[in-house]
Amino acid sequence: MTHLKFELARDLPTLEIDNRTLYRIRALRSGAVGGFVECESNLSQTGDSWIGDDAMVYGGAQVSGDAQVSGSAQVSGDAQVSGDARVSDNAQVSGNALVCGGSWVCGGAQVSGNARIGDNARIGDNARAYGDAQVYDDAQVYGAAR
């Protein structure tokens, strides 16, 4: 039997973005209110993954494993955030991008296209990783780097 960890909080105000309706999530055990998703498949019901604060995950995007999305971060398109990855602040992950491992995307950073961020890499400030970019192995990309 699968134990669900969250539900769509349909009793709370929704958010409209890109002609999509996003719903707040609510933890079933604690009742804590989290961020926004378009549908239940945006956040895995297994593991400790979570979407908090005013973060938004929509489209075909997925958050799984023990990944955390927080602040006002956005994950969209078919992007995936998995493992112990963190996406926070005003960061954006979109397209077919993958953020995994113990990686962090924070500040106003943007990861898009087919970019891959993994193995404890850090992308922050207003840095951009796009196209087929790959950032791995504890690499750190900050400032206005592209």
Model regions and ranges:
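Terminal amphipathic alpha-helical/low-complexity segments used for targeting or macromolecular assembly
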Residues: 1-48, 54, 72, 114
